[in-house]
UniProtKB/Swiss-Prot annotation:
Sample GO molecular function, one term: nucleic acid binding
Organism: Sulfurimonas denitrificans (strain ATCC 33889 / DSM 1251)
Family: Belongs to the UPF0102 family.
Record protein name field: UPF0102 protein Suden_1901
A UniProt-annotated Pfam family: UPF0102
Source organism, top-level taxon: Bacteria
Amino acid sequence: MSRAKGNVAEDRASLFLLENGYMIVDKNFYSRFGEIDIIAYKEEVWHFVEVKSALDYELAVQNITKSKLSKLIKTGDVYLKKNALHVDYMYDAIIVTPENIWHLENITL
């Protein structure tokens, strides 16, 4: 996915989260392990969100690999330590297609 398409998908995902009661805390947080597209907060739970975009749901979901999720988890750990946060959190994915947006909460390896 090109950076421009990625930005559009991340903007749509951010708007989706805001419309569903989340507060956007940070975007594009980088560590040596990888990047977190969106860090959001709702009901005392922090959400580290990977955004995937494709023409259809299946293509986007296939891009959430074990390697990508492992990098997301390691980067989330860095964020928590850097900010001295001792909070409830989960790792999510948001799938963006031209027609729909899906929020997959608490994804695991």
